[in-house]
Amino acid sequence: MATLLNGKELSEELKQKMKIEVDELKEKGLTPHLTVILVGDNPASKSYVKGKEKACAVTGISSNLIELPENISQDELLQIIDEQNNDDSVHGILVQLPLPDQMDEQKIIHAISPAKDVDGFHPINVGKMMTGEDTFIPCTPYGILTMLRSKDISLEGKHAVIIGRSNIVGKPIGLLLLQENATVTYTHSRTKNLQEITKQADILIVAIGRAHAINADYIKEDAVVIDVGINRKDDGKLTGDVDFESAEQKASYITPVPRGVGPMTITMLLKNTIKAAKGLNDVER
């Protein structure tokens, strides 16, 4: 039976440590501030944004939400981002994805100042991450790595298999694991013999957005299984990309859904916001 990697518990511990750090910064006259921009009325996006606001409040990070109509023009959104870039009281800027169809997502991401890009999506920060330089790491991969480290799970020489190749999770977590001296294999929708490959994984990371796509048949005995998927069942409950009940019989460690990777993603956003505030104000990190 697998040991749970409980992201909810770990995130609460980390937030308490961050609160102490934020209080110390406030004593120096610096309050980290995050601006979240939400375009449209996507219920899932609204829920995520609420979670971010709540987490900011717990740690003492200041935050504000700019809510914009679905039909706002791209130029208007770019103007708002520019204003936030030039506001010295704002340290982190997050544009909640996905954006409406009339928006060029890449152009919007590129418009955020790299120094305030707390999502870690700007190409300058992605490039720095790739070369191992100090930068903002995308929040979900950062959360996964933090969870693995919290249990002293050795990555060196281990075979990590990633199912999914998105810019938000799949690609960056592979780079981070490579920097930890893991051997990394990417798999995706065009991969042949997927099961054959995943059964070689010491660490299996699943990020495909399809409920229960992976079960115990895909998992090597005693593998570490990280389930990034968040899917809503017919009864409204959340479930992951991994069939938890079968997988936990085979894995050594496994993340649940919910209370796994999700809470860690928000917590790493807070960590990046504190980092941004320090960097913009020349405070020692």
Swiss-Prot record:
Function, as annotated: Catalyzes the oxidation of 5,10-methylenetetrahydrofolate to 5,10-methenyltetrahydrofolate and then the hydrolysis of 5,10-methenyltetrahydrofolate to 10-formyltetrahydrofolate.
PANTHER family, per database record: C-1-TETRAHYDROFOLATE SYNTHASE, CYTOPLASMIC, C-1-TETRAHYDROFOLATE SYNTHASE, CYTOPLASMIC-RELATED
Any one cellular-component term (Gene Ontology): cytosol
GO molecular function: methenyltetrahydrofolate cyclohydrolase activity; methylenetetrahydrofolate dehydrogenase (NADP+) activity
Keywords for this protein: Amino-acid biosynthesis, Histidine biosynthesis, Hydrolase, Methionine biosynthesis, Multifunctional enzyme, NADP, One-carbon metabolism, Oxidoreductase, Purine biosynthesis
Pathway the protein contributes to: One-carbon metabolism; tetrahydrofolate interconversion
Source domain of life: Bacteria
Taxonomic lineage of the native organism: Bacteria, Bacillati, Bacillota, Bacilli, Bacillales
InterPro entries: Aminoacid_DH-like_N_sf, NAD(P)-bd_dom_sf, THF_DH/CycHdrlase, THF_DH/CycHdrlase_cat_dom, THF_DH/CycHdrlase_NAD-bd_dom
Protein name according to UniProt: Bifunctional protein FolD
Binding site for NADP(+): G164, R165, S166, S189, I230
Keyword Glycoprotein: no
NADP as UniProt keyword: yes
EC number per UniProt: 1.5.1.5, 3.5.4.9
